[in-house]
Amino acid sequence: MKYTRLIGTVIAFCMAVPLFAQQYKATIPYRMVGEKMVIEMKVNGNARPFIFDTGGRTALTTKACQALQITATDSMKVTDVNNVESYYKTTRIENLTTPDDVINFKNAPSLIINEVKGWECFGVDGIIGSDLFASTIVSIDSQTKNIIVTSAEKPSTVSLRKMLNFTKEGGMPIVNVQIAPVSNITVLFDTGSPSLLSLIESDFERIKPEASMEVVSEGYGEGSIGVAGQADKASSYRVHIPLLSVGATKFRNLTTHTDKHPYTLLGVKLLQYGKVTIDYPRGRFYFEAFQPDNEINNQCNNFDLTVKDGDLFVSTVWSSTK
């Protein structure tokens, strides 16, 4: 399913600060719904479902704001997944609390967005993004289906050998990975993306002469759905990558596709292969792989599907280039 993204730097959107300064450790369980991580947070005491999205900003739908009697206080410019810039209303959530009541993010800033097409099946009121956790350390464990949020007085105890530094300002988990033999690419770790890797066209064109990649098919169809709407139909490529390295962890024989996002995305499927810890204040990304070497060999259909107005449609048709 196509997905929604609210791209932007955390630093540009004022941070929520936990209510207390002492050490804390909160647990947020999650469940997978249609390749999305769905969590519950308490909004002014009311438990509400959200998509957990490390590549996005915290946001409430207009419908949720009406139900919770939350009003707009300001507006700001946002760039969505399709690089479309629009102005959106913003608000402050007086109390945004973890489900175990351990952390209360006071006056948490939130965008106000319209209901996004295709979200009906998720049954959520919005997005919890990286901006909310800017002063914390977040660990995501797919084996326990828990997100652990801790205070950041001390760095993570995970080995520095498993650590990648953030490569850009702004507090988003943007790091460098490698495509064999020598190509470095900058990726955004984005739990809102359903793939292991989604390669932007500019990265594909830049590294194509030096990387060991093969175009296996070409597709034409609908673009990704962003908060400003759906992108125009466009062509894209399916690409076979013999070796992708995330730190010391290797992923072999991966098939991905090109897209037009602002960044190449390292998606939620990474969690199937290891535990992720993000130290936001220090700009550190840790990946503790279950296995150091992983054979992917993902199978791809000749078409992609999407949901539109409650019905299932073919969104992209792929044809062989051989």
Task: Put a short name on every predicted segment.
Residues M1-A26:
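Bacterial Sec-dependent N-terminal signal peptides
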Residues A21-K322:
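Pepsin/retropepsin-fold aspartyl endopeptidases
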